[in-house]
């Protein structure tokens, strides 16, 4: 006979189900479950007296050789991804996601997609949220400790450039030349995250660019501090087209070599990743923002100006001066910094993100941005925009799924698509590396409970190692076994160009990590940006800097209070 329980009883045992809503942190956002893969009454749960025991939800006969037997099951998780908000079990094998569905023992249970056997471990996710590991595509590799800070925020992939604390690295996300690229590929062997490095994109001799792609760069960065001229940009794009890599552009703030229109004329119809498209991080003043209307531009913006608050403008001048090696005693340097900080375009940035005109969010780490705040600031923007603009079309009370899917895509699948790594990472889908972040809903967007990297727990909140239980204070982030021994190399990927991959860069440098080629980049357009592909007409008033979308002035009010802030950081 069947057993009936109340909704509250069910939720406390197995987590929310279809129609239930979860508040994300202390924001005003609610995720509503669209589908539950569980068979009611046959949910697989672990623990004393629970169902995952021998002969029950754990199959006693099968071995690991069965392709449907998981190494790890994340049970009863609420999965939030760019295309779904569902309740499901996640099956992981050999470090990769192989199934999303219902886990258990098919001998006695119905509709089992994932077999739990004697070789299977369990992460209990009842009442928890699971997301794909985040991808930050604007990283200045200045300090190796950035990787740990980012990991503890839910970021599992870094793309950018640098060689350490050099002036070039502090300013330009560039790893210049084969020697530096090889050294950074070797250094990545000791990092607990996936990485890809961008070379320097300034050269009229294509050989100087090609040798960097051959050395393993996944693309080229054209930056104004090295000279973002139309000529340099065009040459870099020529090489990118030949080798199927991405170009990242920090355009010409001073308009020395041309205006925004000249840059777009040099680009033609070729795809590129436009960094900090709002312009405070750099780029044609005051109208770089107009580039987001082009179908071949994949626009991102960076977290120092997100969301717009009453402190944003004041803090930026000093950041620009330090990052770009400017001299406060030189009036022209002060004018350069001032030209980038425009409250009107900053106020429009949040709205453009909310409309899906800007497709991605990244950090600009230690070069005006904060490497551990990409995810937090993304959800703060989403909260502010719901507060100011109301629900998105299709959303309603206690269901912000459309907005949630739009915003999570900005730091997961869209960066992966942009840089040619979406075959490997960027979403919770079968066939992808199991880079998975587990959140208590109360702490969503701020502090993950644990991070699974390549199928193994890499970082987790855990108590005193001498405690009698794992929750003995002090509870803090601690390295897990995914960061020890050979696991550092067996659970993370290093991304390289296809030509470097085919020529055996892993063997040439004796790399132990999983080395994978970037691919399918040059045919991209903004239409490929999930939930963030809008291309309206954009204009900027050259006198007032006001931003217009299809003729309508857009702006936002400076926030004086935000969620996901001080109540989460008392200690």
Curated annotation (Swiss-Prot):
Compartments in which it is found: Cytoplasm
EC number: 3.5.1.5
Protein name: Urease subunit alpha
One Pfam match: Amidohydro_1
Pathway(s) of this molecule: Nitrogen metabolism; urea degradation; CO(2) and NH(3) from urea (urease route): step 1/1
Binding residue positions for Ni(2+) 2: 221, 250, 276
Top-level EC class: hydrolase
Designated gene of the protein: ureC
GO cellular component terms, A-Z: cytoplasm
GO molecular function: nickel cation binding; urease activity
Catalytic activity: urea + 2 H2O + H(+) = hydrogencarbonate + 2 NH4(+)
A Gene Ontology BP annotation from the UniProt entry: urea catabolic process
Annotated Ni(2+) 1 binding sites: 138, 140, 221, 364
Source organism of this protein record: Staphylococcus aureus (strain JH9)
Keyword list, A-Z: Cytoplasm, Hydrolase, Metal-binding, Nickel
Details of cofactor binding: Binds 2 nickel ions per subunit.
Binding site for substrate: 223
Modification after translation (UniProt): Carboxylation allows a single lysine to coordinate two nickel ions.
Main location (coarse class): cytoplasm
Required co-factors: Ni cation
């Amino acid at each position: 006979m069947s057993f009936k329980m109340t909704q509250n009883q069910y939720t406390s045992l197995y987590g929310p189900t279809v129609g239930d809503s979860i508040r994300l942190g202390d924001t005003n956002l609610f995720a509503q479950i669209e589908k539950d893969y569980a068979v009611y009454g046959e949910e697989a749960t672990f623990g004393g007296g629970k169902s995952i025991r021998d002969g029950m939800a754990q199959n006693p006969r099968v071995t690991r050789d069965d392709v449907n037997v998981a190494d790890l099951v994340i049970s009863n998780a609420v999965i939030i991804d760019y295309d779904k908000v569902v309740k499901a079990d996640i099956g992981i094998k050999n470090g990769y996601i192989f199934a999303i569905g219902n886990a258990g023992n098919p001998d006695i249970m119905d509709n089992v997609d994932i077999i739990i056997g004697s070789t299977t471990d369990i992460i209990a996710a009842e009442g928890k949220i699971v997301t794909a590991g985040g991808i930050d595509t604007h990283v200045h590799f200045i300090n190796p400790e950035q990787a740990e800070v980012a990991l503890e925020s839910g970021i599992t992939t870094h793309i950018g450039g640098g060689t350490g604390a050099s002036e070039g690295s502090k300013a330009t996300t560039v790893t210049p030349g084969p020697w530096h690229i090889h050294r950074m590929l070797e250094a990545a062997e000791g990092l607990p995250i996936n990485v890809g490095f961008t070379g320097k994109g300034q050269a009229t001799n294509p050989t100087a660019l090609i040798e960097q792609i051959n050395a393993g760069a996944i693309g080229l960065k054209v930056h104004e501090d090295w000279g973002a001229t139309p000529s340099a940009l065009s040459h870099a794009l020529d090489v990118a087209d030949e080798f199927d890599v991405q170009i990242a552009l920090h355009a010409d703030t001073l308009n020395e070599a041309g205006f925004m229109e000249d840059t777009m004329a040099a680009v033609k119809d070729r795809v590129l990743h436009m960094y900090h498209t709002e312009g405070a991080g750099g780029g044609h003043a005051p109208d770089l923002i107009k580039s987001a209307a082009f179908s071949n531009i994949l626009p991102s913006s960076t977290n120092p100006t997100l969301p717009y608050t009453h402190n944003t403008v004041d803090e930026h001048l000093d950041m620009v001066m330090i990052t770009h090696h400017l001299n406060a005693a030189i009036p022209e340097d002060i004018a350069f910094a001032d030209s980038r900080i425009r409250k009107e375009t900053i106020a429009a940035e949040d709205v453009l993100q909310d409309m899906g005109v800007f497709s991605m969010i990244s950090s600009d780490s230690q070069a005006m941005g904060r490497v551990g705040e990409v995810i937090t600031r993304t959800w703060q923007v989403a909260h502010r925009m719901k507060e100011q603009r109301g629900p998105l079309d299709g959303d309603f009370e206690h269901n912000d799924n459309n907005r949630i899917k739009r915003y999570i895509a900005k730091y997961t699948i869209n960066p992966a698509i942009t840089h040619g790594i979406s075959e490997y990472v960027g979403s919770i889908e079968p066939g992808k590396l199991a880079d998975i972040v587990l959140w208590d809903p109360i702490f969503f967007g701020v502090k993950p409970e644990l991070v699974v990297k390549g199928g193994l727990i890499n970082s987790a909140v855990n108590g005193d190692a001498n405690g009698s239980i794992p929750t003995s204070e002090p509870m803090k982030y601690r390295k897990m076994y995914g960061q020890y021994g050979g696991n550092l190399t067996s659970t993370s990927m290093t991304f390289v160009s296809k030509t470097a991959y085919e020529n055996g860069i892993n063997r040439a440098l004796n790399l132990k990590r999983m080395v994978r080629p970037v691919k399918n980049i040059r045919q991209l357009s903004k239409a490929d940006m999930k939930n963030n592909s809008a291309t309206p007409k954009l204009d900027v008033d050259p006198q007032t800097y006001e931003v217009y979308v299809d003729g309508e002035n857009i702006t936002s009010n400076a926030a004086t209070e935000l969620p996901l802030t001080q109540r989460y950081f008392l200690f």
